[in-house]
Amino acid sequence: MTPEGITPKVTIPSPSLIINRDHRSDLYADYYDSWTDFLDDLAKAYHDTIQHFYDLGARYVQLDDTTWGYLIQQFENEKNNPEKTAELAKIAEDDVYTINKALKGLPEDLTLATHICRGNFKSTYLFEGGYDSVAKYLGQLNYDIFFLEYDDARSGSFAPLPTIWNNRDHVELVLGVITSKDPNLENVDAVIDRIHAAAELVPLKNLGISTQCGFASSEEGNLLTEQDEWN
């Protein structure tokens, strides 16, 4: 039994990590009649798994997702290549389709969140760029909470926030304005100013703050001490 006042949480990778990423879906035709059949089965596997976590007591499931950071970087790299840009857009569309199908019909008292991760190995990162190129896709995803990295300039401006929020009153955008990569602490007034700036674009009641990522996305962790983390 879960103690009163405790919300059991499970974090898992997003199904988008399997869709046209690092050749993980190259062999789909060996097992499925069509690409859509593959996506549907992937969505069902995730749906059933999340439901199982719920049945075991979880009431908060978060899907960690590096695909959107990857797409941000790729859209920028290929902006002068229409053919490649179209391929990237198709990946984004397939991601939205699969994720939403996986989330459909889950219990209403289950909170569904995602963290848009850009990499966090030894205080470095994999991807950079603003959310502008993927905002319209994020705005279609049926999550309750979006954790968005915003700890430095590599994440771009707050301009895409209204598109991501998409006038959904129940959706919360949690802004990762506190870095977990660097032991130096942020100026409190500067953080407050940033939240007020975001609140000019999205209602304050739909905003939250957090660290941009965890302290250790891998065994090695970031370049800071345990005491730095508690500070």
Residue ranges and their predicted role:
Residues 1-231:
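Domain-level signal for soluble alpha/beta catalytic cores
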